[in-house]
Amino acid sequence: MNISVSEVKLIDIVQKMMSNYYLKLGKWSCSRIAWKASNYVTGGLYRVAGTAWSNEEAVHWSLILKVVVPAIQADDPQHYNYWKREVLAYQSGILEQLPEMIRAPRCLAVEEQDDHTIWLWLEEVTDRIGAEWTGQQYEEVVRLLGRFNGAYLCGVPLPDEAWLCKGWLASWVEECDKYDDRSVLNEEAWEIPILKGLFPTNIVRRYKEFYRTRGLLLKGLQRLPRVLTHNDAWPPNLFPQGKDSLIAIDWAFVGIAGLGEELGRLYGLLLHSSVDTAAAVATRNDFLNRLLDSYIAGIREAGWDGDSDWVRFGFTASAGMRCGMVIPKLIEQINKKKDEELLTDEMKARCNIAVHLLELAEEASLLLPKILGGRRS
């Protein structure tokens, strides 16, 4: 997408950002960030940067311009990917009222364009970690996410705007179902020999049971204590500012969800993003449990003292639900290859990840009677 930035508008934005309305604009440039959009409501990300002059002194500045694209298929405010949600989140002021340990980038301007796209002019943020996080850094970040979510159970008012998604995961599952022909529920789909070494012998029965009970898992998630969630909180969108504060970008999925879902979403995305990382994570229950313990510790720091099983259910159910997308795709891809020699190590690793996700869903099912039959803590 080609864009044309108005210098007159840019001057106003830079002056506002610098809190200096006498600044004069110097040289500047606008360059598209080398990033492939994974969301069809994002038309592009641009870095706009340059110098400004104040009393003959040069001041360097930079901004991020995010182009939001209208999408008919995501025009329902309760659709998980409602195209205008992030714009409304900034305009409403909700993102300026977050608990102290987390903040969104400052929004300098919202511009509606003649082509019906909307431009978000945002503060450029950086972190203090770098590209690769250590296990300890993951724990520190999820502790902050626990404090963020837990704050809404301990005095911070829960927003109720109509455009906040109240059933993000259920909407996502419904969208995924549009691309699933259900063939994986038939025994025939699993009969090719190469599948026998990739999955446990009882995988068909177990997956069918998951598919049968997933509606109950979603119902259980609705029973959990309700909190404000980012819903896309994982390393590319999180910028730690030390041990006690965090900047989160990309609030397009912000909504109301159950306690624990934030962590389940992070964990599921982590497994999906990098096979090397995922393969290591999926075979290390200590990492999973350390993340969960850190998240619960953050909730406790916020002041919530409820039953941790509710949190564990939120985590395992929301992460495990991802197997309903992953397994059908894998079986389809493997059936196309037929020959075991054509299967890559990556594909084999993804099969292990899929089984791990299914195991999480099964753990959630064991907790389900307590969740559906108990009182919210």
Language model features with spans:
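Conserved NTP-binding catalytic cores of kinases and kinase-like/nucleotidyltransferase enzymes
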Residues: 1-115, 241-246, 260, 368-377
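C-terminal amphipathic "assembly/sorting" segment characterized by alternating charged
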Residues: 29, 319-377
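Residues on conserved beta-strands of the protein kinase catalytic domain
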Residues: 61, 118, 226-227
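Active-site activation/catalytic loop segments of kinase-like enzymes and analogous catalytic loops
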Residues: 88, 260-303, 320-339
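Short, glycine/acidic-rich hinge or "gate" loops at secondary-structure transitions
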Residues: 106, 112, 156-169, 305-312
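Conserved short submotifs of the Hanks-type protein kinase catalytic core
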Residues: 117-127
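ATP-dependent phospho-/nucleotidyl transfer catalytic cores
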Residues: 125-147, 154-230, 339-347, 356-359, ...
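Catalytic activation segment of kinase domains across protein kinase-like and atypical kinase folds
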Residues: 235-272
